[in-house]
Amino acid sequence: GCALNSLANNQILINNYFEKIFIPYAPGDAGGSIGSALITFRKKNKDSFANLTTPFIGSAYSNEDIEKIINNDQRLKQFKIKYYKNRLELNNLIAKKIYNNNVVGFFNSRMEFGARALGNRSILANPCSPNIKEIINKKIKRRESFRPFAPSILFEEKNNWFRNSHYNPYMSC
């Protein structure tokens, strides 16, 4: 779990203590299960090597699975299902919804494994809305008010928002 200290990881990175640094997508205690599985795999399969190159190793659901869940839950029947093959059209719709202070649940492909939501299972909302934190914490997540939120910005815009910004795909430093 020591690699989950993102503040320490960031200091290691920006102070150039090492030529290269890699912090995995599951740097906390949960990552130990991945390490154990890889060691066991390696012991049993001496001629091959398992390499997990993506954090998106969690469960996945088909469109039919999702429709069934929504149609069988009274609380979810109010939601309409619409499929988008054009990603730009979907992105524009999401941007408009967020701009109009709607909260958007984003569900895409496989679930990420690790301490951070990396985009495949996300709650998206307008950060300019003064009461959005309370809405998400109380009404949607039903959690304590002190829980943190993470901003999402385009990679190309990172230097406009952060000092010492760097490529950090797993938000671990």
Task: Please place each PLM-identified region on the residue numbering.
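Flexible beta->alpha loop and helix N-cap segments adjacent to enzyme active/binding sites
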Residues: 9-173
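Glycine-rich phosphate-binding loops at beta-strand->alpha-helix junctions
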Residues: 1-11
